[in-house]
Amino acid sequence: IVSKTVGVYKRYGLKGFCTKLNEKISSPMRTYGKRVAEFLPTEEELGAQREHRFLVEPCISIVVPAYETNEQFLKELLASLEGQSYDNWELCIADGSRTDQVERVIKERIRQYEDAGCRYKIRYERLKENNGISENTNEGLKLVTGSYVGFMDHDDVLERNALFEVVNV
C-alpha cells in the first residue's frame, strides 16, 4: 500500500495525490452500506409486514442453478429466504453438481420444513450433468409453479423485506 501511495504521489504530484485521495475517501462505494441501511425496515416494520395481508398473495418462485455450492453459502441463501417478511415463496433448485453436497443440504432442509409444518417449499432436481448456468437455469424454470419468478445465484442472499416489496408493488 505504501509503494502504491508513493507511486501515485510521484505520478500526479501533491495536488493530484490530494485529489485522488479525496476521490477515494468520498467514493459512493465507501458510504454504500450506510446509505442502504437508511432504507432497510426496522424490526417493528418487518413485523408489520409479516402481519400484512394482501388482496392477492402470489407465490414467488426463486430459481437457483447450483453447482458444487459451498454449504455455508447455500445455508445463508436458505436463511435469507426463511427470514423474508413475505412467506409465500418456493425455491426451485436445479443442481448440476458432481457431488451430493447440495442435495444433502437441501434434503435435510426439506425434512426440517416438513417436521415443522412450514409453508416454505423447495423444489429440487438433481441434473444428470452440468450444462452451465444458462441451461441449469432453464432446468430450474421447469420446476416453477409460482405466479412470479425471480432468479438468484447459489451464493446470493436477499434483504428480509425483498419479497414483500415485490408483492407490494
Regions found by a protein language model. Name each.
Residues 1-5, 9:
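Intrinsically disordered, low-structural-confidence terminal and linker regions
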Residues 18-169:
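Nucleotide-sugar donor-binding/catalytic module of glycosyltransferases
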